[in-house]
From Swiss-Prot:
Homodimer or homotrimer. Its EC number is 2.5.1.15. The gene is folP. It comes from Streptococcus pyogenes. It catalyses: (7,8-dihydropterin-6-yl)methyl diphosphate + 4-aminobenzoate = 7,8-dihydropteroate + diphosphate. NCBIfam families: DHPS. GO terms for biological process: folic acid biosynthetic process; tetrahydrofolate biosynthetic process. PROSITE patterns: DHPS_1, DHPS_2, PTERIN_BINDING. Pathway: Cofactor biosynthesis; tetrahydrofolate biosynthesis; 7,8-dihydrofolate from 2-amino-4-hydroxy-6-hydroxymethyl-7,8-dihydropteridine diphosphate and 4-aminobenzoate: step 1/2. This is Dihydropteroate synthase. Its cofactor is Mg(2+).
Amino acid sequence: MKIGKFVIDGNAAIMGILNVTPDSFSDGGSYTTVQKVLQQVDQLIAGGAKIIDVGGESTRPGYQFVSAADEIERVVPMIKAIKAKYDVLISIDTYKTETARAALEAGADILNDVRAGLYDGEMLALAAEYDVPIILMHNQKEEVYQDVTQDVCDFLSARAQAAIDAGVPKDNIWIDPGFGFPKSVQHNMELLKGLDHVCQLGYPVLFGISRKGVVDALLGGNTKAKERDGATAALSAYALGKGCQLVRVHDVKANQEIVAVLSQLM
């Protein structure tokens, strides 16, 4: 498979989550030193991750805003350290253009924007300037939908076209339906059932549902984040069967065999 100019073996791949934040819902505070980050990256790569997604601000419900300066201070040293030791693709999980530019200069390869370029109006131009892949995620302020699947498809189509209009080659555009941003459990369930429609929009799709609240709901509620990895792996298999090509997860090893097998059947 290809993500922009980068070629990855197989027809599907795993993006390993690396939160260098104090307050992420699943692993906040776990990876705040270079040593701990490199130990975790060792595990992610050994487990089969082809992309490391580095984030410096939590996007969990009720998250605390982080300035671009603080975000840069968190992510840039980690990106440099990872690139110095490993030959692995790095995506920067940010919606701030200032942070994204600093991350690209530090060695990041891919932009992963949970605001789809809408936060400061400059992210799409940055992707075009650096000729890097960008992942555009569905996100909106309120849980109000006429038809959640159709609304998500319309949003992603419009944002992808905006990226093209800004000079981003179509081959550099990936989309993400944005499970949990902001969607009720019912909205997430409907979107899961309609995932094939997202995959038919003409852009490769990232599937990111790892350890989220909808997974807890599917398990009956009251589970801890790390207790959701088995269900996350099952949903990864479902998503790959629907046509997604990239799964973003915390526990890479639990998903690796699923991706390895299903990518040969896609």
